[in-house]
Amino acid sequence: MKICLLNDSFPPVIDGVVNTVLNYASVLSEDGHDVLVGTPRYPDTDYSVYPYRVVSYPSLNTSGLTGGYRAGYPFPVEEMAKMASFEPDIIHTHCPIASGFIARSLRDTTGSPAILTWHTKYDIDVHNSIHDPLLASESIKAIVHNASACDEVWAVSHGAGDNLKSLGYQGNIRVMPNGVDFDKGKASQEEILKACAGYDLPADVPVFLFVGRLMNYKGLPLLIDAFRKIADQADFRMVFVGKGTDRDSLIRKIREYGFAYECREEDEKIHSYPGPVPKGKFIFTGPISQRNILRAWNTRADLFLFPSTFDTNGLVVREAAACGLASMLIRDSCAAEGIRDGHNGYLIEENADSAAEFLKYACRHTEELHQAGIRAQNEIYISWRQAVAQAEKAYGEVMENAKAGLYIREKPLFDDPLYEMTSDAIYRYMHERSKTPPQFPGMLDNLQIAHDSIISSVHERISRISDDLPDELSRILKHFR
């Protein structure tokens, strides 16, 4: 199969969705499929290092608004022509924003089916980034509309699908879980000692671990509040691996409560800060990208703590399970899917009292935690090869459904004219590029003029067509002019 994978981010940015696309591309390529990845362009990035083709397209620097991400231009005609000439059998977008627009345009150009995977609660991301209520609402509508326009929608968990439906999506959803790139097994004692060197980690004190972005909406203040409630009853070490904009506010809360803490700072040295509370300490390692070091921390810890109701899949929970580490999760959260309380993990209510009650118990029953970790390893772990194998099978079903005409919409969407126009522009561009011009002085200048003329005409037609479409689409288009 020829498979076009699209996402609004790619290395040098690393997050859960980027990791998904990297693993899809790697496994599919290893299985003999022809893979192309389309993604916004980041300056000074070499995309030729991958064993598959990467087509990068123009982007805007929105890192101040989005925490390091760039926004891809949703109608990059030249780059879409390159993707269309790839002649994909499947178009699979992992983001409904710029990648969603491109997927729809490619679908109209090539006739191949388009799939969207719903990875995260985009409505929360939108509200965190866009503080104007009207603009945020319109952005969410556009995202859901792009999802509705795809031939199939997949979700990484049942909870992720429920989130999409709560935003107004009315179609069918196929649950397609993500995998983890940890093999089953623990790190060696030598690797653990190397990874944890310099930190205050007594052998007889329980170690709790969190890995991820240090953001308050991940439920991290709840953990600190819970540990405060048991500070006079149990000793512990709470390790935070990662970085995030709320790191400093978490440290302020820890200081306010009188706890000691340690931080690996930018100088790569571990700095210790004492506190009047005699028991308990918090440790901030900073971000860790080396997978062997993350495995070592997952092996050293007694329990993984993940009090997030934001995450739709909780890959870090499965990574912990790969190392035989069980997790404490919020009951009925997406990350808690597949967890049986007290068997292969632990479920609490979303409040500090419930967390404190369980953590007090956990500090005194670490061997029980270890047994739950073994069961988690055997029951909730799924490798990327297993996950992508499920997707490969589903790709075949999607192609058969498309051939049978099962994805033909009974009613056109209000913005279909826009995508018909974009598809026409892609055809025009590909036609012009396929011509063999005569060789004469100034030829390259003339080709550049022709290229610029085509791109300019697309922009002009976007402006004209927006005047004839409903107000909702016009408002969306104004943000791309």
Regions found by a protein language model. Name each.
Residues 1-46, 53, 385, 420-481:
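N-terminal subdomain of nucleotide-sugar transferases
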Residues 341-342, 346-352, 361-366:
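Conserved acidic donor-binding segment of nucleotide-sugar-dependent glycosyltransferases
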Residues 326-330:
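Short hydrophobic beta-strand element within catalytic cores of glycosyltransferases
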